[in-house]
Design a protein with these regions (language model features):
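A general structural signal for short secondary-structure junctions and capping/turn motifs
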Residues: 21-22, 29, 68-72
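Short, surface-exposed beta-edge/turn micro-motifs
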Residues: 1-2, 25-29, 35, 75-78
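Conserved NAD+-utilizing ADP-ribose enzyme module
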Residues: 44-197
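Short, well-structured hydrophobic secondary-structure segments
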Residues: 29-50
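Short, flexible beta-strand-to-coil junctions
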Residues: 5-11, 33, 82-87
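ADP-ribose/NAD+-binding catalytic cleft of ART/PARP-like enzymes
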Residues: 1-26, 41-44
Length: 197
């Protein structure tokens, strides 16, 4: 089996276990046996909006208009091939982790991540669904928007992102989810106001 790891950083020889600054996961090396899935990690982002169909097919569903293009067009990075090993399988399809360092056996420079995704789609390895598809089913769209509202609001609240509105993470939510950002921060600011009795 081939194991992949993607990074915006070139020249790596060994992957050291690290703790994600964005996700609550243990210190580990994350790998995938699916090249198309690895491409998502060419950039560092606050969310990765991919999933799997019941049939096990990888897909990306734009959570906001032109999300894939906006996040990945013109972005480059390295796709690493890692040594074979007895890696632990996670609950996420095609994902494996290692608590130990992992040696790199090969590397491929990806000039444009968005173009690489289009090639993977043409090869039948991923389904890329644009925002219009996401919004075409009113019932599913409402459920997904409600889920995004809840998840992003909790993230803004728990990590206190709203207290640093000029941070990169705050800008990401302000730009891509303006309604959720406004509604959440308005609620939080109201809660912070002193009550006069």
């Amino acid at each position: 089996m081939t194991y992949y790891h993607a990074s915006p950083t070139g020249g790596l020889q060994v992957l050291e276990p690290r703790k994600s600054p964005y996700f609550d996961k243990p210190t580990q090396v994350c790998l995938t046996s699916l090249r198309a899935m690895a491409l998502f990690y060419l950039i560092r982002n606050y969310e990765y909006a991919y999933g799997y169909t019941r049939q096990g097919k990888l897909y990306f569903d734009d959570p906001f208009p032109d999300a894939l293009k906006k996040l990945y067009a013109g972005r480059s990075g390295w796709l690493y091939i890692c040594e074979d090993g007895d890696y632990k399988k996670t609950e996420i399809p095609n994902e494996f982790v290692s608590a130990q360092p992992v040696r790199i056996t090969g590397a491929e420079y990806i000039q444009d991540a968005y173009e690489a995704f289009l090639q993977e789609q043409a090869a039948g390895n991923i389904q890329l669904l644009d925002y219009a598809h996401f919004a075409s089913d009113p019932e599913k769209f409402a459920k997904k928007r409600a889920w995004l509202q809840k998840a992003i609001s909790e993230e803004i609240r728990k990590k206190e992102i709203w207290k640093a509105p000029d941070s990169d993470r705050a800008h990401y939510y302000q730009e891509n989810y303006p309604e959720i950002w406004t509604k959440t921060t308005k609620t939080l600011l109201t809660e912070e106001e002193p009550h006069v009795y």
